[in-house]
Design a protein with these regions (language model features):
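Amphipathic alpha-helical segments typified by the pilin-like N-terminal helix
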Residues: 19-40
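N-terminal alpha-helical membrane-insertion module
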Residues: 2, 7, 26, 30-32, ...
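Hydrophobic membrane-insertion alpha-helices, especially the h-region
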Residues: 5-23
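N-terminal alpha-helical signal peptides/signal-anchor transmembrane segments
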Residues: 38-59
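Low-complexity, acidic interaction segments enriched in glycine
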Residues: 57-210
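Short, structured coil/loop segments at alpha-helix boundaries
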Residues: 1-2, 71
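A generic short-segment signal for beta-strand/edge and adjacent turn/coil regions
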Residues: 15-17, 38, 123-125
Length: 210
C-alpha cells in the first residue's frame, strides 16, 4: 500500500515538473520562432518593396500583380544618371562647357542588377519572392496597389502583408499565436502580422517593423 502511494506521488511529481517546465519552455521557444520567422519575412518584404519602388520610378504607379512585378525584375531595365567628370576637376569641366555638354549622362541597367545590391538574388529567389516563408511556397503575400485621392491629387499606393497565422506554427503554438494576434489587434489596434505600405494613403511604403 505504502509503495503504491509512493509510486503515485512519484508520477504526480514527474507530471508536475513536466507541466512547469513546459510552461517555461513553450513561451521561450515560441518567442524564438517568432523572432526568427519575422526576420525571414522582413527580408522578403524589403525585397518586394525595393522592386515596387523601382517599378514606380519607371511607370509612376505600383503593381498589385506578382507576375508583373517578377517580370519587371527579371526582364526590365532602369534609366540611371551619372556624372561624366569630377566637378572639382576644373580642366575637365571647362572642356565639357566648351563642347556644350552637361556633366551628366544617362544609361540603362537591368533591374535585377541594381535593386538588391549588394545582394545577388538568383532567378529562383526572384520567382519565389511572392511566397511567404514557411508555407512550402504555396501561400503568397497579400499584395494590393491602387491610386487614392490626396488633396485632389491621385497618389499611387501599395500594401504587402503576411499574417502571423500563415507563417507561425499554429499547431505547436496554437494558444501563443492566438494571444499574439489578440494583443496586436485589441491592445495595439495594429495589423496582426508584418506588412509595408498602406491602401489608405501614402506612407512612403513604411514597414510596421520599422
Amino acid at each position: 500500500m505504502k509503495k503504491g502511494i509512493q509510486f503515485i506521488l512519484g508520477l504526480a511529481i514527474i507530471g508536475l515538473v513536466y507541466v512547469v517546465a513546459n510552461l517555461i519552455y513553450t513561451p521561450l521557444s515560441f518567442d524564438q520562432q517568432l523572432e526568427e520567422r519575422n526576420a525571414e519575412v522582413i527580408v522578403k518584404l524589403k525585397d518586394i518593396r525595393a522592386a515596387q519602388r523601382a517599378y514606380k520610378s519607371k511607370y509612376q504607379q505600383f503593381t498589385g500583380d506578382f507576375d508583373s512585378l517578377i517580370n519587371f525584375i527579371l526582364n526590365d531595365s532602369l534609366t540611371m544618371e551619372r556624372k561624366l567628370v569630377d566637378e572639382d576637376d576644373s580642366v575637365a569641366m571647362a572642356q565639357l562647357k566648351k563642347q556644350g555638354k552637361k556633366n551628366i549622362e544617362t544609361y540603362n541597367i537591368a533591374v535585377v542588377d541594381t535593386i538588391f545590391n549588394p545582394r545577388k538574388l538568383t532567378k529562383e529567389d526572384i520567382q519565389n519572392l511572392r511566397y511567404i516563408p514557411h508555407t512550402d511556397n504555396k501561400v503568397e503575400f497579400i499584395m494590393e496597389a491602387a491610386h487614392v485621392n490626396a488633396g485632389n491629387v491621385q497618389v499611387p499606393v501599395v500594401e504587402c502583408r503576411a499574417p502571423y497565422k500563415l507563417y507561425l506554427d499554429t499547431v505547436a503554438y496554437r494558444q501563443n499565436v492566438i494571444n499574439l494576434i489578440d494583443d496586436r489587434v485589441n491592445n495595439f489596434n495594429a495589423y496582426a502580422g508584418l506588412k509595408f505600405g498602406s491602401m489608405e494613403g501614402s506612407n512612403n511604403e513604411a514597414g510596421n517593423w520599422e
